[in-house]
């Protein structure tokens, strides 16, 4: 283990003592020790998303002991590697997503992850920016390519298109040759159009969003990625074409409709190989990350509050070091 971690036994981290409790900054959490196939990351930054609130509230049980450090993904410098790790070495800048948590979470000075969940960060991003990629990047990439199997010429609807998952999904879908219909607030129309959306629907001004979509696409959309919660999610089901398919990330859709397929509560797992593919896409210029705001480590609760207010363009990141 490097001197940076080896000279210390404890670290700081934002943790909860039980599900449903408020997070607190703890100063003497144990620094994890890598097993044979593990990587210990000294964190540069951590991703923030509404999933962090699901973990805090106990809706996503991590099956880990308390105190539980929050945060599922981020970027950092490799502080130590397990004896069986051959593809990575100390001091490499990497990023990772760990769900369910392998050990502790990312909102700490160090995070322990399996080597299979790790990839080098894009050279086109700073280590702090890179911490905003893993969850939203993996989610957009996996749902569009593996689950929805988006192909050239298909009409693909992406709502909350200016958000974390949404703004990456618009770029991936348009890069696949799809005709992207993005749903976003008026202030974000130029933003999502600049990412590759062929059409933008103003969900704030539209009383019936499905009707507005079908006014432009009478046959409906072929595929849809739903990123919104609440009753609003149901409105998008009517926009699907017969035989259409939707991935409903939050599991918010409660209506049924014959002739369409809805895959609910879809959650990606850690995948270093797919993260490496995202790295290649960022470095080729096919993808760009928009960071809404970077918070200091001691401002983690404020960062989560901002995300939950749902007025974020792109990603919110915590700078951990």
Predicted regions mapped to residue ranges:
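C-terminal hydrophobic helical "lid"/dimerization subdomain
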Residues: 1-9, 275-321
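Glycine-rich beta-strand-centered segment in the early N-terminal region that forms part
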Residues: 30-47, 59-100
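Short, well-ordered loop/turn sites that connect or cap secondary structure elements
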Residues: 88-89, 150, 240
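Residue-level marker of beta-strand positions
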Residues: 92-93, 110, 155, 175, ...
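A structural motif shared across PLP-dependent enzymes of the aminotransferase-like
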Residues: 101-115
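Mid-domain Rossmann-like dinucleotide-binding core that forms the NAD(H)/NADP(H) cofactor-binding site
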Residues: 131-205
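Short amphipathic alpha-helix with an adjacent loop that forms part of the alpha/beta core around
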Residues: 207-219
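Glycine-rich phosphate-binding loop and adjacent beta-alpha segment
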Residues: 227-288, 320-321
């Amino acid at each position: 283990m490097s001197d940076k971690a080896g000279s210390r036994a404890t670290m700081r981290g934002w943790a909860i003592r039980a599900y449903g409790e408020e997070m607190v900054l703890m100063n003497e959490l144990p620094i994890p020790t890598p097993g044979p196939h593990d990587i210990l990351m000294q964190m540069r930054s951590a991703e923030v998303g509404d999933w962090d609130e699901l973990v805090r509230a106990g809706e996503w049980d991590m099956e880990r002991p308390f105190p539980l450090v929050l945060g599922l993904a981020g970027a950092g410098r490799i502080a130590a590697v397990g004896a069986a790790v051959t593809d990575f070495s100390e001091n490499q800048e990497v990023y990772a997503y760990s769900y369910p948590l392998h050990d502790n979470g990312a909102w700490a000075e160090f995070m322990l992850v399996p080597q299979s969940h790790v990839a080098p960060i894009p050279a086109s991003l700073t280590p702090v920016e890179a911490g905003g990629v893993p969850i939203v990047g993996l989610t957009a990439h996996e749902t569009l390519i593996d689950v929805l199997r988006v192909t050239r010429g298909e009409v693909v609807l992406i709502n909350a298109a200016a958000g974390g998952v949404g703004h990456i999904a618009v770029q991936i879908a348009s890069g696949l040759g799809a005709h992207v219909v993005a749903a976003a607030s008026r202030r974000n129309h130029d933003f999502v159009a600049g990412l590759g959306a062929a059409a933008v629907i103003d969900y704030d001004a539209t009383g019936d969003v499905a009707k507005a979509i079908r006014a432009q696409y009478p046959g409906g959309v072929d595929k849809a990625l739903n990123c919104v919660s609440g009753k609003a999610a149901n409105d998008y089901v009517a926009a699907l074409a017969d035989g259409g398919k939707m991935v409903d990330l939050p599991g918010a859709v409660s209506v049924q409709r014959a002739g369409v397929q809805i895959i609910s509560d879809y959650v990606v797992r850690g995948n270093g190989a797919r993260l490496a593919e995202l790295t290649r896409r960022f470095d080729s210029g096919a993808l760009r990350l928009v960071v809404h705001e970077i918070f200091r480590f001691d401002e983690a609760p404020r960062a989560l509050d901002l995300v939950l207010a749902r007025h974020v363009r792109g990603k919110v990141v915590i700078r951990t070091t």
